[in-house]
A protein has these predicted regions:
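Alpha-amylase-like alpha-glycosidases and glucanotransferases acting on alpha-linked glucans and related
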Residues: 1-90, 120-124, 136
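Hydrophobic, well-ordered secondary-structure elements that form the walls
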Residues: 30, 51, 95, 141-143
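Hydrophobic alpha-helix feature that most strongly marks membrane-spanning transmembrane helices
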Residues: 31, 56, 100-103, 144, ...
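Acidic/polar loop patches that form or flank catalytic/metal-binding clefts of enzymes
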Residues: 58-62, 101-112
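Catalytic cores of secreted or luminal carbohydrate-active enzymes
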Residues: 81-108
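Short, solvent-exposed loop/turn elements at beta->coil junctions and helix N-caps
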Residues: 112-118
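Carbohydrate-binding surface patches
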Residues: 118-159
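Trp/Gly-enriched beta-strand surface patches
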Residues: 162
Protein backbone atom coordinates (compact mmCIF):
# COMPACT_ATOMS: atom_id res chain seq x y z
CA UNK A 1 0.00 0.00 0.00
CA UNK A 2 2.99 2.25 0.46
CA UNK A 3 3.42 2.90 -3.27
CA UNK A 4 -0.10 2.26 -4.55
CA UNK A 5 -2.92 4.71 -4.95
CA UNK A 6 -6.56 4.01 -4.17
CA UNK A 7 -7.37 3.13 -7.77
CA UNK A 8 -4.66 0.46 -8.02
CA UNK A 9 -5.83 -1.03 -4.73
CA UNK A 10 -9.45 -0.95 -5.92
CA UNK A 11 -8.49 -2.69 -9.16
CA UNK A 12 -6.64 -5.36 -7.15
CA UNK A 13 -9.84 -5.93 -5.18
CA UNK A 14 -11.72 -6.76 -8.40
CA UNK A 15 -9.92 -10.11 -8.41
CA UNK A 16 -12.03 -13.23 -7.96
CA UNK A 17 -13.39 -13.57 -4.42
CA UNK A 18 -12.01 -17.13 -4.11
CA UNK A 19 -8.55 -15.69 -4.78
CA UNK A 20 -9.11 -12.79 -2.36
CA UNK A 21 -10.01 -15.26 0.39
CA UNK A 22 -6.61 -16.97 0.07
CA UNK A 23 -4.54 -13.81 0.48
CA UNK A 24 -2.61 -12.70 3.57
CA UNK A 25 -3.42 -9.11 4.56
CA UNK A 26 -0.87 -7.10 6.54
CA UNK A 27 0.67 -3.63 6.70
CA UNK A 28 4.05 -4.60 8.13
CA UNK A 29 6.19 -7.69 8.62
CA UNK A 30 9.67 -8.70 9.77
CA UNK A 31 11.53 -7.83 6.56
CA UNK A 32 10.01 -4.46 5.66
CA UNK A 33 10.13 -1.05 7.34
CA UNK A 34 7.81 -0.60 10.30
CA UNK A 35 4.42 0.97 9.54
CA UNK A 36 5.08 3.71 12.11
CA UNK A 37 8.18 4.72 10.14
CA UNK A 38 6.46 4.52 6.78
CA UNK A 39 2.99 5.99 7.23
CA UNK A 40 1.47 8.95 9.03
CA UNK A 41 -0.65 7.99 12.08
CA UNK A 42 -3.82 8.54 10.03
CA UNK A 43 -2.59 6.33 7.18
CA UNK A 44 -1.48 3.63 9.63
CA UNK A 45 -5.04 3.44 10.88
CA UNK A 46 -6.56 3.58 7.38
CA UNK A 47 -4.29 0.79 6.13
CA UNK A 48 -4.88 -1.31 9.26
CA UNK A 49 -8.65 -0.95 8.80
CA UNK A 50 -8.23 -1.89 5.14
CA UNK A 51 -6.12 -4.99 5.80
CA UNK A 52 -8.32 -6.12 8.68
CA UNK A 53 -11.65 -5.84 6.88
CA UNK A 54 -10.82 -7.39 3.50
CA UNK A 55 -11.31 -11.08 2.72
CA UNK A 56 -8.36 -13.31 3.54
CA UNK A 57 -6.13 -14.02 6.52
CA UNK A 58 -4.99 -11.10 8.66
CA UNK A 59 -1.47 -10.83 10.02
CA UNK A 60 -0.34 -8.37 12.67
CA UNK A 61 3.36 -7.90 13.41
CA UNK A 62 4.90 -7.76 16.88
CA UNK A 63 4.92 -4.14 18.04
CA UNK A 64 2.47 -2.95 15.38
CA UNK A 65 -0.25 -2.25 17.95
CA UNK A 66 2.10 0.05 19.90
CA UNK A 67 3.51 1.90 16.88
CA UNK A 68 7.01 0.47 17.29
CA UNK A 69 9.57 1.98 14.93
CA UNK A 70 12.65 -0.16 15.53
CA UNK A 71 12.84 -3.23 13.32
CA UNK A 72 14.52 -5.89 15.39
CA UNK A 73 16.99 -8.36 13.92
CA UNK A 74 15.66 -11.91 14.14
CA UNK A 75 18.33 -13.01 16.62
CA UNK A 76 18.10 -10.08 19.03
CA UNK A 77 16.66 -11.28 22.34
CA UNK A 78 15.82 -7.89 23.83
CA UNK A 79 14.15 -4.78 22.56
CA UNK A 80 15.46 -1.23 22.97
CA UNK A 81 13.27 1.22 24.84
CA UNK A 82 10.87 3.06 22.53
CA UNK A 83 8.17 5.61 23.08
CA UNK A 84 4.76 4.09 22.45
CA UNK A 85 1.86 5.71 20.63
CA UNK A 86 -0.69 5.34 23.44
CA UNK A 87 -3.67 5.96 21.14
CA UNK A 88 -2.75 3.15 18.74
CA UNK A 89 -3.45 0.23 21.13
CA UNK A 90 -6.90 1.71 21.80
CA UNK A 91 -7.53 1.85 18.04
CA UNK A 92 -6.39 -1.76 17.54
CA UNK A 93 -8.47 -2.99 20.49
CA UNK A 94 -11.58 -1.47 18.91
CA UNK A 95 -10.63 -2.77 15.46
CA UNK A 96 -10.08 -6.33 16.72
CA UNK A 97 -13.37 -6.25 18.62
CA UNK A 98 -15.16 -5.07 15.47
CA UNK A 99 -13.67 -7.65 13.10
CA UNK A 100 -14.34 -10.44 15.58
CA UNK A 101 -18.00 -10.35 14.51
CA UNK A 102 -19.03 -13.39 12.44
CA UNK A 103 -20.13 -11.16 9.55
CA UNK A 104 -16.45 -10.44 8.79
CA UNK A 105 -15.64 -14.16 8.50
CA UNK A 106 -18.86 -15.76 7.33
CA UNK A 107 -20.59 -12.89 5.57
CA UNK A 108 -20.76 -11.83 1.95
CA UNK A 109 -18.14 -9.30 0.88
CA UNK A 110 -18.73 -6.84 -1.99
CA UNK A 111 -16.53 -4.17 -3.50
CA UNK A 112 -18.43 -0.90 -3.87
CA UNK A 113 -18.20 1.77 -6.52
CA UNK A 114 -17.70 5.38 -5.51
CA UNK A 115 -18.76 8.45 -7.42
CA UNK A 116 -18.13 12.15 -7.34
CA UNK A 117 -18.34 15.22 -9.51
CA UNK A 118 -16.35 15.82 -12.71
CA UNK A 119 -14.71 18.96 -11.32
CA UNK A 120 -13.62 17.30 -8.05
CA UNK A 121 -11.74 14.01 -8.45
CA UNK A 122 -11.08 13.60 -4.70
CA UNK A 123 -13.52 10.66 -4.61
CA UNK A 124 -10.90 8.67 -6.53
CA UNK A 125 -8.91 8.47 -3.27
CA UNK A 126 -11.63 6.30 -1.72
CA UNK A 127 -11.92 2.56 -1.59
CA UNK A 128 -15.21 1.11 -0.33
CA UNK A 129 -16.59 -2.36 0.38
CA UNK A 130 -19.38 -3.92 2.37
CA UNK A 131 -19.98 -7.03 4.43
CA UNK A 132 -23.42 -8.58 4.88
CA UNK A 133 -24.75 -11.52 6.84
CA UNK A 134 -28.46 -11.86 7.51
CA UNK A 135 -29.60 -8.48 8.87
CA UNK A 136 -26.10 -7.34 9.82
CA UNK A 137 -24.44 -4.97 7.33
CA UNK A 138 -21.24 -2.94 7.39
CA UNK A 139 -20.01 -0.38 4.90
CA UNK A 140 -16.30 0.44 5.04
CA UNK A 141 -15.10 3.55 3.23
CA UNK A 142 -11.39 4.35 3.46
CA UNK A 143 -9.72 7.56 2.30
CA UNK A 144 -6.22 6.54 1.19
CA UNK A 145 -4.97 10.08 0.66
CA UNK A 146 -3.78 12.82 2.97
CA UNK A 147 -6.59 15.11 1.81
CA UNK A 148 -10.28 15.46 2.51
CA UNK A 149 -12.63 14.11 -0.10
CA UNK A 150 -16.01 14.91 -1.56
CA UNK A 151 -18.14 12.04 -2.77
CA UNK A 152 -21.74 11.44 -3.63
CA UNK A 153 -21.43 8.26 -1.64
CA UNK A 154 -20.64 4.75 -2.71
CA UNK A 155 -23.00 3.22 -5.22
CA UNK A 156 -23.47 -0.22 -3.76
CA UNK A 157 -23.83 -3.24 -5.98
CA UNK A 158 -27.39 -4.55 -6.25
CA UNK A 159 -26.36 -7.93 -4.87
CA UNK A 160 -25.23 -6.27 -1.62
CA UNK A 161 -28.85 -5.57 -0.77
CA UNK A 162 -27.95 -2.44 1.13
Amino acid sequence: MEHDNAESIRLHLWADLAYQGKLLRFIENHDEPRAANTFSPQKQRAFALTAATLPGAKLFHEGQFEGRKVRLPVFLDRRPHEAIDHELPVFYTKLLEAINRPVFREGEWSLCERTGWPDNPSFLNLVAWSWRKDDERYLIVVNLSDFEFVSRGPILPAEAGI
